[in-house]
């Protein structure tokens, strides 16, 4: 039983108004919209993950060392930052949202438990960024014995070379990278 796992595709990461946005985003939004519509038509479960609100340095933890003690990259004052574009936004009472503090949406969250309760055995993983949160989530999903499929047009990264290298590694080790048309 498959579920769609949409990782970090809030405006903060897909809207060019935010500095975290990557270059591949117009095509990515179209792919996210298409696969979301497919899952909704088939009445299959959709899970979303996004960052938790990490205003205090203790809550950000080791991010402080990696990114510096600034809010520029991991926090935005703009209230739209944590919203999803309307084209594929979660539906209240229907879709599930998991809040995370680290790259993997499985790390110290109830996601695995929720997926098991929902009898999910396969995850279609979409979102950003391929070299960070996508890869971390895919490896953890694989480690929890979920089959993982990544539609290559439905993931993105700020770095094209990192994107390609991580898709190669995912396909070799922990998931199946497939064309979006084959997944739909």
Per-segment meaning from a language model:
Residues 1-3, 37-42, 67-184:
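Active-site-adjacent betaalpha module
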Residues 1-92:
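Active-site acidic carboxylates
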């Amino acid at each position: 039983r498959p579920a769609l796992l949409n990782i970090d595709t809030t405006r903060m990461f897909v809207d060019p108004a935010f500095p975290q946005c990557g270059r591949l985003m117009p095509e990515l939004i179209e792919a996210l919209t298409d696969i979301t519509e497919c899952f909704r038509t088939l009445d299959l479960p959709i899970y979303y993950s996004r960052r938790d609100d990490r205003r205090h340095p203790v809550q950000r933890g080791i991010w402080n060392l990696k990114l510096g003690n600034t809010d520029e990259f991991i926090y935005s004052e703009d209230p739209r930052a944590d919203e999803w574009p309307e084209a594929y936004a979660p539906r209240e009472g229907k879709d599930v949202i998991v809040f995370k503090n680290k790259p993997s949406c499985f790390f110290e969250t109830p996601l695995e438990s929720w997926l098991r309760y929902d009898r999910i055995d396969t995850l279609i993983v979409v979102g950003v960024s391929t070299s960070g949160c996508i890869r971390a989530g895919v490896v953890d999903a694989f480690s929890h014995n979920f089959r993982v499929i990544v539609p290559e047009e439905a993931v993105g990264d700020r770095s094209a070379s990192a994107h390609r290298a991580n898709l190669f590694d995912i396909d070799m080790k922990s998931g199946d990278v497939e064309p979006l048309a084959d997944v739909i």
